[in-house]
Design a protein with these regions (language model features):
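Bacterial Sec-dependent N-terminal signal peptides
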Residues: 1-29
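Lipid interaction determinants
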Residues: 18-140
Length: 140
């Protein structure tokens, strides 16, 4: 008799416990990456070129220029994570502009997350919370 009572009580707890669901609420709203940004730092160093990145949220495309060549590709985002796909690029050689172009494309290959605060975009490394690039959103 004791076994039947204990089994019944255990069964009641299991039924009640399995019937409840938990909600996960995100503390921060999802920010859609969109617009044109002027790059101001790469790996913590100020740059003097007019490098720009443009994110199109409708078709998830990225476009950019660091003073000479255009590059383009696709991106996906989920909350604060960011993954940039394979980039295509024009192949002109421009004296002085190539250093920033290579640096920006390397950053875009290694980005894992982003943050937008007060119109400033920061791209972070995929392996650590290290800022790789900062940019200011252009007025539209």
């Amino acid at each position: 008799m004791k076994k039947i009572v204990l089994t019944s009580i255990t069964l009641c707890f299991l039924i009640v416990g399995c019937n409840q669901t938990k909600k996960v609420v995100l503390d921060t709203p999802t920010v859609l990456l969109s617009g044109i940004f002027t790059v101001i730092t790469i790996n913590g160093e100020d740059i003097s070129s007019s490098a720009v990145l443009q994110f199109n949220k409708a078709d998830k495309k990225i476009w950019g220029n660091a003073g000479c060549n255009d590059f383009a590709g696709t991106y996906t985002q989920n909350a604060g994570s960011l993954n940039i796909g394979q980039l295509s690029s024009t192949k002109a050689y421009c004296e002085g502009a190539m250093k920033n172009e290579y640096a920006i494309q390397k950053v875009l290959r290694n980005v894992g997350s982003f943050d937008i605060s007060n119109g400033n975009l920061t791209l972070y490394s995929a392996t650590e919370k290290k800022p790789l690039l900062t940019a200011i959103k252009n007025k539209e």
